[in-house]
C-alpha cells in the first residue's frame, strides 16, 4: 500500500511487479546517464569560445550519433517487449474472477463456483475502523488464494473504468461491451489495495479495490461459508 510521502514504487508482491520494478530502475539509470551526457554537451558548447570555420561535415560523427542512440533504444526496448508479452501470457489459471465496473463500485463473480458473486463498495470515512485506511477500505473484500495464478476478466456496465492493483503489477481497462483479461500471482498473504485508474465521473476516487490473499485452506473455508450463507 502507498504510504505518506512515498517517492518510490510500492513493494512488489508478485513476480510480474518485481520485473516491472527492475525494468523501471534499469530504464531510469539509462535515462539519467543520457540526461547527464546531453547536459554536459550543452554546457561545454555554451562555455566554449573556440570555433572551427572550416568544419563543414563529419561522416564519422554523424554515424556515431545515429548508431549509438539506436543501440540504446534497442537495449531499452528488449526488456520492455519481454514484459509486454509476459503480461499477456495466460497459462492454466487456478481461478477465474470476473470484475465489473459500475458508477461507482465494483462487482465480482467467481466463475468457477455457483452463486458466488457480490458487490464491493467503499466504506465511508465515518465508518472506517481504527487502523484501516480511508478511501481504500471496502465492505466486501476480494478473497483469493495465495501463490496461485489468478485470471481476471474485466468489463464495465456503464462507462470506462480501470481495474488496477499496483503492488501486484495489474492494470486492465474495463470497457462496456468488451471483456478484457489479465493475470497475476500473489506471492504472499496480505491485503493489496488498488483503485479505479480511469476517470469515470464524480465519484471516480471512491471506488477502491481490496484483495485479501490467504492460504488455500482459508480460501476453501471462506467459499464454503459464503455459499452456506
From Swiss-Prot:
It is a multi-pass membrane protein. Cu cation A2 binds at residues 196, 198, 200, 204. It is found in: Mitochondrion inner membrane. Mg(2+) binds at residue 198. InterPro entries: CcO_II (IPR045187), CcO_II-like_C (IPR002429), CcO_II_C (IPR034210), Copper_CuA (IPR001505), Cupredoxin (IPR008972), Cyt_c_oxidase_su2 (IPR014222), Cyt_c_oxidase_su2_TM_dom (IPR011759), Cyt_c_oxidase_su2_TM_sf (IPR036257). It catalyses: 4 Fe(II)-[cytochrome c] + O2 + 8 H(+)(in) = 4 Fe(III)-[cytochrome c] + 2 H2O + 4 H(+)(out). Keywords: Copper, Electron transport, Magnesium, Membrane, Metal-binding, Mitochondrion, Mitochondrion inner membrane, Respiratory chain, Translocase, Transmembrane, Transmembrane helix, Transport. The chain crosses the membrane at residues 27-48, 63-82. Pfam families: COX2 (PF00116), COX2_TM (PF02790). GO terms for biological process: ATP synthesis coupled electron transport. Residues 1-26, 83-229 are mitochondrial intermembrane. GO terms for cellular component: mitochondrial inner membrane. Residues 49-62 are mitochondrial matrix. Binds a dinuclear copper A center per subunit. Its cofactor is Cu cation. Cu cation A1 binds at residues 161, 196, 200, 207. SUPFAM superfamilies: Cupredoxins, Cytochrome c oxidase subunit II-like, transmembrane region. Its EC number is 7.1.1.9. GO terms for molecular function: copper ion binding; cytochrome-c oxidase activity. Component of the cytochrome c oxidase (complex IV, CIV), a multisubunit enzyme composed of a catalytic core of 3 subunits and several supernumerary subunits. The complex exists as a monomer or a dimer and forms supercomplexes (SCs) in the inner mitochondrial membrane with ubiquinol-cytochrome c oxidoreductase (cytochrome b-c1 complex, complex III, CIII). NCBIfam families: CoxB. Belongs to the cytochrome c oxidase subunit 2 family. Component of the cytochrome c oxidase, the last enzyme in the mitochondrial electron transport chain which drives oxidative phosphorylation. The respiratory chain contains 3 multisubunit complexes succinate dehydrogenase (complex II, CII), ubiquinol-cytochrome c oxidoreductase (cytochrome b-c1 complex, complex III, CIII) and cytochrome c oxidase (complex IV, CIV), that cooperate to transfer electrons derived from NADH and succinate to molecular oxygen, creating an electrochemical gradient over the inner membrane that drives transmembrane transport and the ATP synthase. This is Cytochrome c oxidase subunit 2. It comes from Paracentrotus lividus. The lineage of its organism: Eukaryota, Metazoa, Echinodermata, Eleutherozoa, Echinozoa.
Amino acid at each position: 500500500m502507498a504510504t505518506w510521502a512515498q517517492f518510490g514504487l510500492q513493494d512488489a508482491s508478485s513476480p510480474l511487479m518485481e520485473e516491472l520494478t527492475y525494468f523501471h530502475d534499469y530504464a531510469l539509470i539509462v535515462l539519467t546517464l543520457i540526461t547527464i551526457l546531453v547536459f554536459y554537451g550543452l554546457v561545454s558548447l555554451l562555455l566554449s569560445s573556440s570555433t572551427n570555420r572550416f568544419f563543414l561535415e563529419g561522416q564519422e560523427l554523424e554515424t556515431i550519433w545515429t548508431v549509438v542512440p539506436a543501440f540504446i533504444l534497442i537495449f531499452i526496448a528488449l526488456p520492455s517487449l519481454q514484459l509486454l508479452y509476459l503480461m499477456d501470457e495466460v497459462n492454466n489459471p487456478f481461478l477465474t474472477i470476473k470484475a465489473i465496473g459500475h458508477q461507482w463500485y465494483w462487482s465480482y463473480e467467481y466463475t468457477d463456483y455457483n452463486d458466488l458473486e457480490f458487490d464491493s463498495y467503499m466504506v465511508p470515512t465515518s465508518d472506517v475502523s481504527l487502523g484501516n485506511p480511508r478511501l481504500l477500505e471496502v465492505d466486501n473484500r476480494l478473497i483469493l488464494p495465495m501463490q496461485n495464478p489468478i485470471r481476471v476478466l474485466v468489463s464495465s456496465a456503464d462507462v470506462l473504468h480501470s481495474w488496477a492493483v499496483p503492488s501486484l503489477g495489474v492494470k486492465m481497462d474495463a470497457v462496456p461491451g468488451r471483456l478484457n483479461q489479465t493475470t497475476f500471482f500473489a506471492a504472499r498473504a496480505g491485503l493489496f489495495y488498488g483503485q479505479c485508474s480511469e476517470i469515470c465521473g464524480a465519484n471516480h476516487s471512491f471506488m477502491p479495490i481490496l484483495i485479501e490473499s490467504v492460504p488455500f485452506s482459508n480460501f476453501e473455508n471462506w467459499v464454503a461459508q459464503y455459499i452456506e450463507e
